[in-house]
Amino acid sequence: MAYLLSFGIVAALFLASISLYRYGNIPRQHILVTLSVLTAWCFSFLIVFTIPLDVTSTLYRQCVEEHRPTPAPNVTNTSSATVGPPPQCQEPWGMVPASVFPNLWRIIYWSSQFLTWLIMPLMQSYLKAGDFTVKGKLKSALIENAIYYGSYLFICGVLLIYIAVKGESLDWQKLKAIASSASNTWGLFLLILLLGYALVEVPRSLWNNAKPGFALQYAYFKAAKLSTEKAEAEEHVDDILESLQGLSRVIPNNHELRPCLETILRKVPIELQERASRNFARTGGSGMGATSSTILPSEKALVRIHKQVIKSLQTLQRTEALWSVQVQTVLHLEDVAKNIHSSDRRFKSEFPRQRTQLERICYSASLQWYWECLLKAPFLKTMCVLTATMSAMVVWSELTFFSRHPVLSIFANVIYVAKESYDFFTIEVFSMVVLCYFFYCTYSTILRIRFLNLYYLAPHHQTNEHSLIFSGMLLCRLTPPMCLNFLGLIHMDTHIIPNRIMETVYTQIMGHMDVIGIISNGFNIYFPMCMLAFCLATWFSLGSRALNALGFQQFLQNETIATELVQEGKDLIAREKRRRQRAEEAMARRRDFNRTDQVLGSDYLSKYRSGGPGGLTSSRTPADGLLRDGDGSFDYAAVASSSALGVPRSLSEEINDRFGVSTQVQVGFRDPDYEAETDGRIVGPPPRGLFDDV
């Protein structure tokens, strides 16, 4: 009967692996980063998939306890047979031995806490450190985390003083409860923010995406903003590299700091180095980022600029990749707008991509037209209605789940009705659906979070290691409070609704939906009110309006700035389309020229290679081969620069050429124009080790 648990473990591992493959670049990132993020994501998904099994197991144990026959006081039972479960209680599908869930939750809890509070923060700080030795990087990572955790220790000290003043005794169990309450408090308040935004934004985004005109206008707006961010990232990189060029001229080759400078220069792409050298020569070292000082810098100065180089190059690479993705999105939406009124009902693309035979059979042009132009909009609107209904149920249950008599929570009433008939299958399915919606709302908001343009999960293998580690930390810290909130909504947290049901194994190990005692008074009032306030603020777009008033452009209809940015996005996309058209025309001309050259020179080349009777002599001169009259199988154009010949490059090649070979990074980026025959390409060798800078 444990096949559901096995299926949940496999599904969690599969989803974590697929997500890591989509967002990360597994062949390029370090193996420790891959394993840590995979473990964090897998445990977070596993908690969501396993909670329904724990709920049904708890309800089954309660059923057995309620229907257990009471033995008569004067009757001695001499039978040695084991008493089976009552006939009213049927084992749920996911029933496992009693020792499985306690051991599973302990493994998940302590592994997640160890990863999210110790290992992953140290790894993140190590990756951002600009030192040039292992000892220096570890020292910087420890100092940064000591400052971070020092604030937590200060808060804990204040709480301990508060408890001591009240005259309460402290032991290990109470300290553990305080730590669990503090963690739950942090997670619950962050959950309020994420759910309050997502419960409104998820249905609204589905409805807006069902309107092709609105989606296209918003895509133009995002393209204009990404273009601005890309230009700012390029300017920031140029300023830092000009300063680096000045240091390169100041530090002599035989100086002890020269190897440190060479370590920084090896991370800078060749193209960017050459451009920085030209800018430095043109401005004479008087640019914004340049320095004209002849004083030798200290090692701390090099560490600081090394850290700036790492951060600026990551930002530039991410903006380049996101710009390419956004261009493909806009081009696709334009194709949809042009094909809506097509008479032959076949989807035609302005820039068609080469598709495999299987794609042409399973997803033909006619089928694509029916989906993109006829069925997709009604499907998205239907999903909008369903998610809006689910959001309304969640908000109502959040507002009323503290009510014991009468029970007003919708989710709690559904569980009670199914429990009365011992319909464990309905309980499992309903719990899974609700948790998956919580999961989608919370995690989709995390995937769109941007902190100072540093942490951002970009698809198509464009997410750096810092952002992957940060997302793993955030998921490990948010998943337990999210599941505790769900157990509170269905009235299965005994600290909220006592003496009603048995306690789940999850709450026994992970703790309860408790908060710090100082703020626990009135928590059942301000927690739902905060959730409702965030939902209303998102519904009326108060956050977007406030950011727009502060100068951060947001997509608001009937706003002059938004209209100007939409028009700017149209112009940028039109320029990009002209560039692609010129590249395609140049490639077609080169293809025709090569074909004509091969036809006209085939006879001459065959005689030239034969060297036999009637042919050319086999003697060679130094001038032979200058006009490509050698072996036709060797294509010089294949090794030439594709940009110089006007050949359109893939997005991966554009980014790799932009960042150069010196970065030792080949971006495995797959855009919608990715061809099937490129599947056999090797992304590149894995990194040399964790300490490449040493």
UniProtKB/Swiss-Prot annotation:
**Which UniProt keywords are listed?**
Coiled coil, Glycoprotein, Membrane, Transmembrane, Transmembrane helix
Localisation:
Membrane
Q: Which residues form a coiled coil?
A: 222-249, 564-592
Q: What is its main location?
A: membrane
InterPro entries associated with the record: GPCR-associated_LMBR1, LMBR1-like_membr_prot
- One Pfam annotation, family name? LMBR1
Q: Which residues lie on this side of the membrane: Cytoplasmic?
A: 27-30, 128-144, 203-381, 448-467, 536-694
Q: Where is this region: Disordered?
A: 673-694
Question: GO cellular component annotations, sorted alphabetically?
Answer: membrane
Which residue spans traverse the membrane? 4-26, 31-51, 107-127, 145-165, 182-202, 382-402, 427-447, 468-488, 515-535
**Lipid bilayer topology:** Multi-pass membrane protein
So what family is this one in? Belongs to the LIMR family.
Q: What is this protein called?
A: LMBR1 domain-containing protein 2 homolog
